[in-house]
From Swiss-Prot:
This is Large ribosomal subunit protein uL2. InterPro entries: NA-bd_OB-fold (IPR012340), Rib_uL2_dom2 (IPR014722), Ribosomal_uL2 (IPR002171), Ribosomal_uL2_arc_euk (IPR023672), Ribosomal_uL2_C (IPR022669), Ribosomal_uL2_CS (IPR022671), Ribosomal_uL2_dom3 (IPR014726), Ribosomal_uL2_RNA-bd_dom (IPR022666). Residues 1-28, 206-240 are annotated as: Disordered. The keyword Ribosomal protein applies. It comes from Methanococcus maripaludis (strain C5 / ATCC BAA-1333). Keywords: Ribonucleoprotein, Ribosomal protein, RNA-binding, rRNA-binding. Part of the 50S ribosomal subunit. Forms a bridge to the 30S subunit in the 70S ribosome. One of the primary rRNA binding proteins. Required for association of the 30S and 50S subunits to form the 70S ribosome, for tRNA binding and peptide bond formation. It has been suggested to have peptidyltransferase activity; this is somewhat controversial. Makes several contacts with the 16S rRNA in the 70S ribosome. GO terms for cellular component: cytosolic large ribosomal subunit. One of its GO terms (biological process) is cytoplasmic translation.
Amino acid sequence: MGKRLISQNRGRGTPKYRSPTHKRKGAVKYRSYDEMEKDGKILGTVVDILHDPGRSAPVAKVRFANDEERLVLIPEGIQVGEEIECGISAEIKPGNVLPLGEIPEGIPVYNIETIPGDGGKLVRSGGCYAHVISHDVGKTIVKLPSGFSKVLNPACRATVGVVAGGGRKEKPFVKAGKKYHSLSAKAVAWPKVRGVAMNAVDHPYGGGRHQHLGKPSSVSRHTSPGRKVGHIASRRTGRK
C-alpha cells in the first residue's frame, strides 16, 4: 500500500501545514468604526515600526488620542513620530484612513474594507495599491492590482498611499537557505518535489527507470483520494 499524498496529509492539519500565526505581532486591522470616525476624525501617532514574520510589509504601532493602540499597515514614506488621521474629515494624505466615498478619483489606496467596519481585507501586500476609479449613488468602483474592478460600499474604509515594502521581488533569493527561512514563516511546504521524481510508493507518477507519468494524467472527479493527481475532471488537456 502506498503512502498518502501531500494533499491528503494537508487535510489532516498537522503543524507542517498550519500557518504559524503564533509568530505574528498581532491582528493588523483598523480600529472599530465608531462615532468619532463617522462624524469627524481621530488622531494617532506612529510610536514604532515592526517587522511581522510571514508578512511582506512592515507594520506600525499607532497610539491614538484616546490611548488606544493598534497595529496598522503603513505606506511608503511614513516614519516614527508622524501623525495619521482616521475619519470622514481626515486629510487626503498617505497613511490617513477615510471612507472610500470621501477619497477622490485616481488616488492610490490600500487595505480596503469589503464590508464597513471589517478592518480591511483587500490590497495588503508590500508595494501594492488600488485606484479609486469612480463614485456613484451608493457605490464606489475600485480597480484592484489584478486589474479587476470591484464595486464597494462608499462607507468602506481604505488607507491613502502605497503599502511599504515595495520592490521586495526585485532582489533574488540566490540561496536555497534564504528561501527556506523565508517560507518557514508561512504555511508553505517547501521544497516542492515533482511526482515523477518520487518513488512508486510515494506518488502515482513515481518509480520507473526514467521519469515519466506511465499513465493518463486525466482522472475522474470521483476517483479515490490517493489517485487524484494531475488533470482532475479536465474537459481538455494540451495546447489549444
